[in-house]
């Protein structure tokens, strides 16, 4: 019946910058692009589908309308996406070389290491290296 999580959606007002970050820094590839001329808000929206290892992130940009930013950090509801990395030190060194700030961690626990970065919209992205 239920097979897998198909995609996660991120609303942005910086579509090109966000696509560049996810593809140029994090290694996602553009799977598809779409434009819907009249969304539920009555304005056109641009969609970019990004793929990483079979998981898709759908970027959504509403044309010409102000959208309230998501609440920061601790709140009820979804909080962040997490990317698994092979080597936390190499991943964080690479991200820093690209000008990406590691805003939390790395913190090493018995079975994993984790750190956090932010995308250009300020959304948290967790990095996780499993040791088992």
Model region roles, listed by residue range:
Residues 4, 43-46, 77, 111:
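Exposed loop/turn and edge beta-strand positions of beta-sandwich/beta-sheet ligand-binding modules
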Residues 1-19, 78-83, 131-132:
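N-terminal beta-strand motif that seeds the catalytic metal site of vicinal oxygen chelate
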């Amino acid at each position: 019946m239920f097979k897998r999580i198909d995609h996660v959606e991120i609303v942005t007002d910086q579509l090109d910058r966000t696509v560049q970050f996810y593809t140029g820094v994090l290694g996602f590839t553009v799977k598809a692009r779409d434009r819907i001329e009249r969304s539920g808000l009555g304005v056109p929206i641009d969609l970019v589908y990004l793929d990483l290892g079979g998981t898709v992130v759908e970027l959504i940009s509403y044309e010409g309308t102000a959208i309230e930013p998501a609440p920061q950090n601790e709140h009820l509801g979804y909080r962040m996406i997490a990317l698994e990395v092979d080597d936390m030190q190499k991943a964080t060194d690479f991200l820093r070389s690209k000008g990406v700030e590691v805003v939390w961690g790395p913190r090493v626990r018995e079975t994993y290491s984790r750190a956090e970065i932010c995308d250009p919209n300020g959304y948290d992205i967790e990095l996780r290296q499993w040791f088992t």
